[in-house]
Amino acid sequence: ILAVCLFLMPLIHEPLDRTVSLRASIRPRVFVPRDGRRLFVAVAVVYLATWMVGCFFQSFSAPIAYTCFGAASPFAGSIILALAMAPSVLGGPAVQKFHPKKALAVSFAVVVASTAALALFVATGAELAFMAACAVFSFSMGACLATALRMLLLEVNVLQVSAILASINLVAYA
């Protein structure tokens, strides 16, 4: 599929005129909108919080399955990782019709609550409850990230999109 996409890329019409050279377009541009600095900080907090827990799952799903729940099969760790990541794709579309500020506040509160529940269920060895909390966390993480990004993108024009995305990803990966 990736090879087909690679060969089809040159055939896709780019709606924007080329304004910079290829060399300049490869260099990341950091941009924070003057009027959206507080929003940028809020989005950065959302990204960092959700990505950190997501990275935790990517690194420690198998050890959690073995150490906390006694599952020796790699399948258990895979299920934990899948439940912690896959439902996130449903979060954004589920909240797109709601007011962005309210959707972000509610979804982030659910992220915090589900993260606390994950810690509780690991400590108590409640495997099924942990799996359910993984799915709730993932869904709310997707809602948070999609809503936060939508709010940030509404603050910039189309020529600033790549710069704002580079900036928020720089914060997330730093």
What are these regions (language model features)?
Residues 2-20:
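C-terminal membrane-cytosol helix-exit motif in multi-pass small-molecule transporters
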Residues 36-57, 131, 135-139:
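Pair of pore-lining "gating" transmembrane helices in MFS-fold secondary transporters
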Residues 57-65, 148:
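Hydrophobic/aromatic end-of-helix segments at the C-terminal termini of transmembrane alpha-helices
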Residues 64-69, 97, 151-156:
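Helix-to-coil boundary motifs at intracellular loop junctions of multi-pass secondary transporters
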Residues 67-86, 163, 167:
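Loop-to-transmembrane helix entry
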Residues 76-100, 111-114:
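Transmembrane alpha-helices of Major Facilitator/SLC transporters
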Residues 102-146:
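C-terminal transmembrane helical hairpin of 12-TM major facilitator-type secondary transporters
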Residues 138-143, 149-174:
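A late C-terminal transmembrane helix in Major Facilitator Superfamily
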